């Protein structure tokens, strides 16, 4: 099993933590990661685009002129697509762009991105992130002590609200629970800051 250094909130190395090689030590599958990221980005699309077809455009209920005898081309409605102000043909309608990939694929993608972060030395383990109250300055001190000055995703255990509240005003810092962090969240960050309890949660979820 791979070992990573374990720090406290002051940036002092206190021990090491063993990582499960089946989760944090596999050969990253870039193709699977790509597929999952595309899927998750597609799910974020609003899909609220819409146009009016000939049935939705106001007016046009009356035939503009009689069928025969005028010498003009026959028309049934002034809201037909060929008319100015008419309806749109085959335009976009509201829809969901989301689609689901198999659970095995999603799990492999998570293992791949975690393994990549560990291999690239972009995985920082911290004993805990506990705050007496939500304080942005206190969280900033922790990041400074750990020499983290790039875009970071902080993974905490369920129920650690003060950590999330303390970090939300900091630029380039995102907080998620270990059980709900997505592949897109992880690949979007330069580094991962993970609590010891969150590591255990990740290993439980992906075991």
UniProtKB/Swiss-Prot annotation:
Top-level taxon of the source organism: Bacteria
UniProt xrefs under PANTHER family: 50S RIBOSOMAL PROTEIN L4 (PTHR10746), LARGE RIBOSOMAL SUBUNIT PROTEIN UL4M (PTHR10746:SF6)
Entry GO CC: ribonucleoprotein complex; ribosome
InterPro entries cross-referenced by the UniProt entry: Ribosomal_uL4, Ribosomal_uL4-like, Ribosomal_uL4_dom_sf
Protein name as it appears in the record: Large ribosomal subunit protein uL4
Keyword Ribosomal protein on entry: yes
Sequence intervals crossing the membrane: none
Pfam families, per database record: Ribosomal_L4
A molecular-function term among this protein's GO annotations: rRNA binding
Family: Belongs to the universal ribosomal protein uL4 family.
Chain positions covered by the region annotation Disordered: 49-78
GO BP annotations, alphabetical order: translation
Gene: rplD
Signal peptide region: none
Gene3D superfamilies: 3.40.1370.10
Subunit-level organization: Part of the 50S ribosomal subunit.
Keyword vocabulary terms for this entry: Ribonucleoprotein, Ribosomal protein, RNA-binding, rRNA-binding
Free-text function comment from the UniProt entry: One of the primary rRNA binding proteins, this protein initially binds near the 5'-end of the 23S rRNA. It is important during the early stages of 50S assembly. It makes multiple contacts with different domains of the 23S rRNA in the assembled 50S subunit and ribosome.
């Amino acid at each position: 099993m791979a070992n990573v250094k374990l720090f406290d909130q002051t940036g002092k190395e206190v021990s090491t933590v063993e990582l499960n090689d089946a989760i944090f030590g596999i050969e990253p599958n870039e193709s699977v990661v790509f597929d999952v990221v595309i899927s998750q980005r597609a799910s974020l699309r609003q899909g609220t685009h819409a146009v009016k077809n000939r049935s939705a455009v106001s007016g046009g209920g009356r035939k503009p002129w009689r069928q025969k005898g005028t010498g003009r081309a026959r028309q049934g409605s002034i809201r037909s697509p060929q008319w100015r102000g008419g309806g749109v043909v085959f335009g976009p309608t509201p829809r969901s762009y989301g689609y689901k990939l198999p659970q095995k694929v999603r799990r492999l993608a998570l293992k791949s991105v975690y393994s990549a972060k560990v291999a690239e030395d972009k995985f920082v383990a911290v004993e805990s992130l506990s705050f007496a109250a939500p304080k942005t300055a206190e969280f900033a001190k922790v990041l400074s002590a750990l020499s983290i000055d790039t875009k970071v995703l902080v993974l905490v255990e369920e129920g650690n609200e003060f950590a999330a509240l303390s970090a939300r005003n900091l630029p380039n810092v995102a907080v998620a629970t270990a059980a709900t962090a997505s592949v897109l969240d992880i690949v979007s960050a330069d580094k991962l800051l993970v609590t010891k309890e969150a590591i255990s949660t990740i290993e439980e979820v992906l075991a």
